[in-house]
Amino acid sequence: MSAPVQEAISNFDIGARIRTIAVTAVVVLAMAIIAAPAAQAQTLSILHTFTGGQDGGKPQAGLTMDQAGNFYGTTPQGGAGYGTVFKLSHTGAGWVLSTLYTFQGGGSDGAGPIARVLFGPDGALYGTTNAGGDSNFGIVFSLRPPITACRSVQCPWTETVLHRFTGFGDGTNPGYGDLAFDAAGNIYGTTYFGGQGGIGVVFKLTRSGESWTESVLYSFSDSGNEGSLPYGGVVLDSAGNIYGTTLGGINNQGVVFQLSHPGSSWMETVVHSFGGPPNDGEAPYGTLIMDQQGNLYGTTYKGGTTGAGTVYELQPSGNSWTYSILADLPAFSNSGGPTGALTMDGAGNLYDTTYGDGFVGAGNVFELTPSGSSWTYTDLHDFNGQDGSHPYGNVVLDAHGNIYGTTFGPGYGEVWELTP
């Protein structure tokens, strides 16, 4: 798949919209770029190179790590031609990839998973496929390990299809959005198309015994400033409010939204409307993350002072939010900013990848470190096309500070480790 959709989005002057920016962050960022134009000394190791065969190919989602240090991910190609779910385990002989499930496509099964798989409260893996199912509009699925012990490296897991999207009423094509879970184990997500307006929905899957019921919580209509085409997934706060991002909106640059449930129906509130360059970001593709204080963090694929995207924060204060740009990403090649969700470590540092930035336009891995009211940008690694290219997804960190992720290329893609 090519670079993310909606590449051409018009500029807009943010004007009088209230916006808080740490000016020192811009200064520190500029100094970091001038003082250290090359990536910091890191060691990149390729853990697996996909062949496009039974092991899968062209990963677009990031990884999920379990408590034992194993990694789980998806590929939209390979297997039986419809994609796979894989596990990467470290053994005495090194890293070994096992295919947990091979999608079969058609009406009964999904095809083309491009979002992460995540562990639910019950320990099963949950995810979506962008296609397949009855109408080829995608599915929501779960995977469970074998009940009996399996000594083989290739131990297939059991898939259960929780929902098959049927058309425009219940949403179509869940795409890149990460799923989210509440305390009761209910599942929340987005679809890029479908719904009453045909431009996306936020949905919920409620469990009752062994069955699941889908309900559409909100259908985007792009009337006024509400946004359209949610590319990323959603996150939930402790009160059950739902947060996400869309394209479109009053400035046609994207929005951050909140869904609350004050009565019998869900109500949308636009938390922030992006204004586009040079004063703001545009195209918020990645799923938001939330810290323990309820602050939201996200990225934009483009926009900002450099046009290469931004990293931003939204802080709640009563019924309002304060929006701050933490960093305008440097435009080394300006071929595509971040598309995956940010990752925050225990010290509050933020990590992500860009799809096509870096010195050769093949993407990079970066870190943002807070220092008082400013943030320092560090380019950890520039992919050169030989050691990987075009990372779409998020990164994960282990307890030792090693960083793990996937790249779309070269060939059929890779899983990599970046060691300080």
Regions found by a protein language model. Name each.
Residues 2-420:
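Extracellular beta-propeller repeat domains
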